[in-house]
Amino acid sequence: MMKPLFPLIISLLTFGGGLYAQNFQLNKSGYFQDKGVDVMAFDDIYPEGHQGGVSLIMHGHRIATNGDIRLEETPGQWQPVPKQRERIADPQTGTIKTYLSYPDSSRHMTGFNPMIYPDLHFNYEVITKAEGNAIRVTVNLDRPIPSEYIGKVGFNLELFPGILFGKPWLMDQQGGIFPRQANGPTLESRSNATRSWDYIHSDKSIDKQANKDILGRQGDYNPIVADDIVSAPYSTGHTFTVCPDDPLLRFTVHSEGSELKLYDGRMNHNNGWFVLRAEIPAGATKEAINWLITPNVVQVWIYQPVVQTSQVGYHPNQPKKAIIEIDKRDNRIQKAQLYRLTSNGKELAMEKQPESWGQFLRYHYLSLDFSNIKESGLYQIQYGESLSSVFRIDKTVYDRGVWQPVLEYFLPVQMCHMRVNEKYRVWHDFCHMDDARMAQSMNHIDGYAQGASTLTRFKPGDVVPGLNIGGWHDAGDFDLRIESQSGEAYILSLAQEAFGVDYDATSIDQQKRITEIHQPDGKSDILQQVENGALTVIAGYNALGRLYRGIICKDLRQYVMLGDAGAMTDNQLGNEDDRWVFTEDNPSRELETASHLAAVSRVLKGFNDTLSIQALKISRELYEITKVDNRSKNAKIHAATELYLTTKETKYKDYLLAEKDYIASHIDQIGWYIGRADKAMNDRSFSETLRKALADYKGRIEEQGGETPYGIPYRPHIWGAGWNIQEFGFKQYFLHDSYPDLFKTDYIYNALNFVLGCHPGSNTASFASGVGAVSATVGYGLNRADWSYIPGGVISGTALIRPDFPELLTFPFLWQQTEYVLGGGSSHYMFLVLAAQKLLNEHD
């Protein structure tokens, strides 16, 4: 929803954007700008995530992106993207030239998510140039497109559906409305997949090469194919206008050559966008595409200030600081008001001029400190016409409905090999009871790869019994990665040790495979979840004789499945729909898992002694048998630390003491966990060496934390940074707990506030779904097709549209902004809340 604008601006909008002369300039940041409208060209590098090519930001909202040559009418995540070779921005001529080519051999049948390129080879340049109040986009090819690909190759511009549903469009003289769902009819054509490139990576091992028969499987629907069936265009013409009724979103594209066609990408990808497309004509090279994009620039528009606070609130003893994000052209710094909400309405609790912090990304920032306000109650901050969400100040602010949804909802919903009920509701039925078969040797999807050897007694395709127990689905994809399974159990174990979590709202029966949300069973929920993680790791080790790399579905049709996890397979072991189990030789991951299991063993003692003993046994074995190299030494130290804390055995202590110089030189990675061993070992020389290194590390953190108005190290790249910031705060707790004279609590609180809403951009939602006054209630989880959420899941958060636009869209299909994950996504958040609760109550 568009944010309300200042009254003056609203009164002027009816006159359109022609009050003053408009003129796009190529600014110092490398994109075209005129007041509140920006046109980027190939700044972003993530086209499969709808971040790339030519992009258009209209008055604070990214409405179009991925303007580039594509080989399908409506490509998705799995379709070929070009290789970007060079980008040259020339402020003197107001031009950005980008040089690209097809195919990209580094992605063909290899890589994290392999693609299949057709046998089509050409180079091209995309030229974007400011022309007064418009941007001209031209495309030049180095050769004509072969006849068999005419109609397949075209220039696409993707339009963000979330802001356009129900909005009008015009194509020449025809008008229409962007529909909520994709509507037929469909068109059929010969797919590029039938002309696939036969290039073989002769220099790559078998685990770096995809299996075309599996990846490109023919027959029923396969997401790797996006051009055999597409939506019929909603309209065709030469001049297309988006939102002719809205001066804030209106822009026009005129094609001086090929006809424009408006497609709906959701016809063959549920997560697709609307696509405006012009095909490359036969024989064309020079100006094969020639578009003039004319955005409506509202000259009087200015970004409305955004008041950023925690959506939950603050403990009275907690430092309290609101961040106010304003347009860098806005020179009017006003006083801010803090109101207390009473039964009689608002009462002014404080009025104060915020301090100017300076510029970060594209905005100017102000800081409003109200730490002196300690009276319990409901509050709201006003700055000009802008209001924060309502928040609490109270000693009990973290006592209910803040960390608890992680245990009450998110972790139970994510449990694999279970049926999960919530009273009337079934979150998912019995699932993946047919886990698993041994993977084939190949480069699979989502980063999975199996080498020439299975590293076990099992051959490719063999049934591996005993894997259908425990674990949690990776929230978007349903797979089980070793680091997410053991890592989740580890973080929960550390939370139990640090805070003694006593909470029971869920019944979990591992024998009957039934989980009942809000049906207490007299057992600790957090320990039952630690047990759930331990079960899959230990079962995998016992079945395979080693750790699994992960368990994932065998093909893309299963991988993109939306909905009930129980629908992915038939739960009958030994047939073609079974998931695959992968193995690897990865010393770092094996030793990290050893560290996790050592901690798990501690907390399960007395709760599930058998599992506790097995966890420690496997941890010891991994520590002894895993070869250590330069890349895995940190993990060896981590394993030794946790094993020493669990066993107090001298050999682990001696190893740590012998490595004190290495530990000191890598203190930024090791410092957070070594402190507990430092205390327990009580070795003066070791402690002194570490403290010198820690003091230097503290200085580096303070320097980075000072780079942003949020008081934490934060250097956005592409993905939302919420998970990394949570992890930073989690580690800061251990540094503070071990070395309180060096590391204060501010970073813990600042990291928590960031996740709960005090973060860049106009969307100040809490990243924790269902937590706070406004939260991310559209998430990339199992129910994303319904534009819904899982309470207690924590999304990735505000992303960066390069080079400087912070964005958090209300849209369920952008994994880099709204995905939930295991192995820290929610558990680091829960830990942070528990840490704040403990620290603040201690000083009450």
What does each model-identified segment do?
Residues 22-91, 184-230:
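Beta-strand-rich N-terminal accessory domains
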Residues 485, 523-548:
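Carboxylate/His-rich catalytic cores and anion/metal-binding grooves
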Residues 7-16:
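Bacterial N-terminal signal peptides
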Residues 73-144:
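Extended, loop-rich substrate-binding clefts of extracytoplasmic carbohydrate-active enzymes
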Residues 163-170, 300-319, 388-426:
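Low-complexity, Pro/Ser/Thr- and charge-rich linker/hinge segments at domain boundaries
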Residues 136-186, 385-397:
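Acidic (Asp/Glu-rich), glycine- and aromatic
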Residues 206-248, 256-259, 267, 312, ...:
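Aromatic (Trp/Tyr) and acidic
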Residues 139, 280-295:
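Short Pro-Gly-centered flexible turn/kink motifs
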